Swiss-Prot record:
HAMAP family: CofC
InterPro entries registered for this protein in UniProt: CofC (IPR002835), Nucleotide-diphossugar_trans (IPR029044)
Top-level enzyme category: transferase
Keyword Nucleotide-binding: yes
Record function comment: Guanylyltransferase that catalyzes the activation of phosphoenolpyruvate (PEP) as enolpyruvoyl-2-diphospho-5'-guanosine, via the condensation of PEP with GTP. It is involved in the biosynthesis of coenzyme F420, a hydride carrier cofactor.
Gene Ontology MF terms: GTP binding; phospholactate guanylyltransferase activity
Stored Gene3D superfamilies: Spore Coat Polysaccharide Biosynthesis Protein SpsA, Chain A
This protein's record includes keyword Thylakoid: no
Protein family according to the UniProt entry: Belongs to the CofC family.
Biological processes per GO annotation: F420-0 metabolic process
Superkingdom as given in the UniProt entry: Bacteria
Official protein name in the record: Phosphoenolpyruvate guanylyltransferase
Record: residues binding phosphoenolpyruvate: T130, G146, S149
Organism: Roseiflexus castenholzii (strain DSM 13941 / HLO8)
Length: 210
């Protein structure tokens, strides 16, 4: 089964507002772009047939183009509606993987692990959200991103009679939304672009993370 990935990206001027007391607007945009690049790098190394970045932000388009992703201009003001827009031309016999742009520790083998699961595969976020979602049948699926989306997506899959596989990946269970998340990212092993930037920001601002 072919796999099509969709990465939704907010307008960067609205990105990471909960980090505003720690990072200025330019730093937040820089971090958001670094995380997007990390996500697209991982997807480009996996066996995904196509990656679509849906956004209204031209800077996101530039990163998407650099990684060979398809650009979809977001015509909506709603995440779930945007996902439907990006998925409209995905073949009925393909699988769709939804990946947020702020999980910079994503690895190619994470993608293939989910792709190997029959039915619906979900990686939960630590706050009750959904950080990876794979569904094999877009025509019969309702996207429910938002508060408590993990439980809601599981219920939606079961309501339709689909098997649900919960794939817990600790390195993907945190969105980078708060200072604690930024510190956590900096402390994890690895040297992604977002990790290097997080360490630079925290060291510059006097945070001791080692």
């Amino acid at each position: 089964m072919d796999l099509y990935a969709i990465v939704p990206v907010k307008e960067l001027r609205h990105a990471k507002q909960r980090l505003a007391h720690a990072l200025d607007a330019h730093e937040r945009q820089e971090l958001s772009l670094a995380m997007l690049g990390d996500v697209l790098a991982a997807l480009s190394q996996s066996q995904v047939r196509r990656v679509t970045v849906i956004s209204r932000d031209t800077a996101a388009y530039q990163i998407a183009t650099a990684y060979g992703a398809v650009i979809a201009v977001d015509q909506t003001s709603d995440l779930n509606a945007a996902l439907y827009q990006a998925a409209v031309d995905v073949p009925d016999d393909a699988a769709i993987l939804i990946v947020p742009s702020d999980v910079p520790l994503l690895r190619a083998d994470d993608v293939m692990m989910l792709a190997a699961q029959p039915g619906v595969a979900i990686t939960p976020a630590h706050d009750g959200g959904t950080n990876l979602l794979l569904t094999p049948a877009i025509r019969g699926w309702t996207f429910l991103f938002g508060p408590d989306s993990f439980v809601r997506h599981c219920a939606e899959a079961r309501r339709r009679g689909w098997t649900v596989h919960v794939v817990r990946l600790p390195h993907l269970e945190r969105d980078i939304d708060e200072v604690d998340d930024l510190v956590w990212l900096a402390q994890q092993p690895g040297h992604t672009a977002a990790q290097r930037l997080a360490r630079e920001f925290l060291m510059r601002k006097g945070a001791r993370i080692w």
